[in-house]
Amino acid sequence: MRKIIVFDQTIREGMQYRGLMFSYAERLKIMEFQQALGVDISQAGYPPAHESEIRHIKKIYHEASRRNYNIRISGLCRALVKDASRMVETGLEEFNLHTSFTAEMLSRQSVESIFNSLKDTVLFIRSKVEKPSIEVSLLDIGKTDMELLKKCAVFLINNLKINILSLPDTSGLMSPNQVCKRVKIISSLAGKNTQIGIHCHNDLGMATANTIMGILAGASIIEVSALGIGERNGIGDIFITGKNLKDQGFDLNLETEKEDIFREYYEFVDSVCYQKTGIKLLNDNTPFFGNSSMTHVAGTHGIGQFGLAADQEFYLNVLCGKHLVENYLKLHKIGYEKKYLQEIVARIKDKSAEADRCVTKEEVKEIVVESG
């Protein structure tokens, strides 16, 4: 299967989440996790924003080089020469530029003037940096006219010969079928020298699914983050996206098998977020890592063939079935005679219906004794 590049934007997207700021030490720790997990590219910040951003990114880049890390360090800026000049100060070789062709932007600027700005910026970078990798993000694929999107893609791919064309659903309003249609069209224009990236926001809860669909439609770079942290509702989740793609046979350097390190990574980002904003991102309902992913209530699920398995929890209410009750009794080491199992299940259901809640362990013990 195709090789997929993992572009972790936890740092820069995280700094756009509800009052969150990452210190240099926190960025370094995040980069260490990314390296340990096989991330290909880390977006360490936004250099034109402030002198401190340039300083932090430069230090992150040099530290990664000093340690002989494989991870590549990048920064984001507008597709303007003045922004790119600040990026050059960091010493980076990975340049992420963004521009917009939405109706609102075109009410202020012509397509030709935006093209000229893009050309000037790309030529400037190439005059200052030997063999840079240049990515351009077109904001955004959901709000830009399809014919204009194709025209922009052809200009960037054929005329400017950029390395990566990123297709972001910045508004987070697209569904997988819409992403598929647009990414497939643009990917068909890419040729062999320009890779297509996919970057999806989560306003309608579709970010991870849309990112996966972008790959299925022809993209080869996922732009994701730890816990899906990012602007507004965030972006695609790095672990869930990566695991899903690997399970489908795609080739990723991302080591989703290192679940313990991923958990540490997520717990670290969550702790920083909670400390600085009072918001917890890692909770019982977090996919894969949340406790709820290992709980069962309905009888069919109690067979143990669904979900993540590992350390499981069982809750008994009117929806429980024989297999789930069996697993519950085994888990809590409650002895019973198998011939009374059906009666035990019926009594548990009756008790739950009567109380309008799940039954407690003590109540289950009483039911088992009474049934025997």
Predicted regions, residues:
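Conserved, mostly hydrophobic/aromatic
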Residues: G14, Q34, F95, V136, ...
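Catalytic alpha/beta core domains of metabolic enzymes, predominantly
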Residues: T170-F289
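Active-site beta->alpha loop and helix N-cap motifs at the rims of alpha/beta catalytic domains
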Residues: I41-P48, R67-C152
